[in-house]
Amino acid sequence: MSTKPAHKIRIGVLQVTIWRNLGEKGNWYSVVPARSYKQGDDIWKETDSLGFDDLLTMGKLFDLAHTWIMHQQQADAKARKESDQAA
């Protein structure tokens, strides 16, 4: 994985982080879900544990991540094709 996420999408306290991974056959992407919560008065933490009320929102975030990745894969393929033609 890269040291910096390719993209983050957030709805409220839920977010997905999208990572771009470089492989021999091109880029591939992975998604990490997270839920932020406050411990005490001022310390924010993250967990990958979701409650019942989080599921539909996280489903929407996964849908948005899927769409973003699909567009990136298309852009990656176009760039590879143009690079191959230039060589």
PLM features: what roles do these ranges have?
Residues 1-87:
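Single-stranded nucleic acid-binding surfaces, predominantly the OB-fold ssDNA-binding core
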